[in-house]
């Protein structure tokens, strides 16, 4: 599962860089940059992870003893931790420029493992630093670079604004089992351009109703044992779609949380949705036939149950009517319309008196 990661320089970006010897080798030289802690706390709420990447010229040499470095460094880490800021890794190159090593920024040696196996969400990750070498590193990694610096670059407040002002609520979740391979991406703030292929034509059509009526974009690719039946495919797509929506919602700050809808055709359906963090499904719908197209009618309830529990939401669904196709379609339409209401960001705070969803 790819992650949104900020690769952050240390000296000159997180803390001040001493002008005498460019070494933070004593406690009296340790000075945090303005707004850095509050900014990282905010960025954490937007599901960013942090990796510290720093060149420490000659670390461990007579001119820069490791003991002088590690004490203020560990104190700095402890201060960040006390505020809930955790660095997934602290990557340090101890070599001087003349060594020609491959780990020194802007070379990729220290970060190479982050570029493997889709670990990194490149569209939403970036390098933050005060030097040109940090921007070259970003280019070498194929991600955004943001130059920090109160004079020629951005302040921490500027950086937060840039990374959150057009926050694209996007997520990708992959689930591979011996029965199915399911990959789902969702964009909660983009509309149209959905791609859905589950191997089941009716199921594809129903999932498209969710995308269209919730005004979100979905890319759903699934392959599996539909030669046996549709059970595992429908179930696993429900699980992965629920997880993807939940992940894309992020910290849920400002969302409406609740939604309800009651559309009418020759079939009527209603849906009540609460993105509550408490999974529950109440489902009432009956079908005359075992199959609707190539989809088992008994799997309709199971799909919404799988989705609700993976999304950690409370979901009530009911449909009435004569035609099985219309009743089925109305359930997916009404869920899409209800989801659209619930995921809209209309405020800034978490919509919960408990402070937790």
UniProtKB/Swiss-Prot annotation:
GO terms for biological process: L-histidine biosynthetic process. The keyword Metal-binding applies. It holds the Pfam family PNK3P. Residues 169-357 are annotated as: Imidazoleglycerol-phosphate dehydratase. Zn(2+) binds at residues 93, 95, 101, 103. It comes from the Bacteria. Pathway: Amino-acid biosynthesis; L-histidine biosynthesis; L-histidine from 5-phospho-alpha-D-ribose 1-diphosphate: step 6/9; Amino-acid biosynthesis; L-histidine biosynthesis; L-histidine from 5-phospho-alpha-D-ribose 1-diphosphate: step 8/9. The keyword Chloroplast does not apply. This is Histidine biosynthesis bifunctional protein HisB. The gene is hisB.
């Amino acid at each position: 599962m790819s992650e949104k990661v900020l690769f952050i320089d240390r000296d000159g970006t997180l803390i001040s860089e001493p002008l005498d010897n460019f070494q933070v080798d004593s406690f009296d030289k340790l000075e945090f940059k303005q707004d850095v802690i509050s900014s990282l706390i905010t960025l954490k709420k937007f599901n960013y992870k942090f990796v510290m990447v720093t060149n420490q010229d000659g670390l461990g040499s007579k001119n820069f003893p490791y003991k002088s470095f590690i004490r203020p460094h560990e104190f700095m880490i402890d201060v960040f931790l006390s505020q809930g800021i955790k660095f997934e890794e602290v990557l340090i190159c101890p070599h001087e420029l003349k060594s020609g090593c491959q780990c020194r920024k802007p070379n990729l040696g220290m970060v190479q493992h982050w570029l493997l196996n889709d670990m990194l969400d490149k569209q939403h990750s970036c390098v933050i630093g005060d030097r040109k070498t940090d921007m070259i590193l970003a280019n070498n990694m194929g991600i955004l670079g943001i130059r920090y610096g109160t004079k020629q670059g951005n302040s921490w407040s500027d950086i937060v604004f840039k990374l959150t002002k057009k926050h694209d609520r996007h997520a990708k979740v992959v689930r591979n089992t011996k029965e199915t391979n399911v990959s789902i991406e969702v964009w909660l703030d983009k509309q149209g351009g959905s791609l859905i292929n589950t191997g089941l034509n009716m199921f594809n059509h129903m999932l498209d109703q969710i995308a269209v009526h919730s005004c979100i974009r979905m890319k759903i690719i699934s392959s599996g044992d539909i030669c046996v039946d549709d059970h595992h495919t429908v179930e696993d797509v429900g699980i992965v779609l629920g997880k993807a929506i939940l992940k894309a919602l992020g910290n849920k700050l400002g969302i409406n949380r609740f939604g309800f809808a009651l559309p009418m055709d020759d079939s009527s359906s209603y849906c009540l949705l609460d993105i509550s963090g408490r999974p529950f499904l109440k489902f009432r719908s009956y079908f005359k036939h075992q199959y609707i197209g190539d989809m088992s009618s008994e799997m309709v309830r199971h799909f919404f149950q799988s989705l609700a529990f993976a999304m950690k939401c409370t979901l009530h669904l009911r449909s009435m009517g004569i035609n099985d196709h219309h009743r089925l379609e109305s359930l997916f339409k009404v869920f899409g319309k209800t989801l659209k209401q619930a995921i809209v960001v209309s405020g800034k705070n978490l919509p919960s008196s408990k402070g937790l969803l």
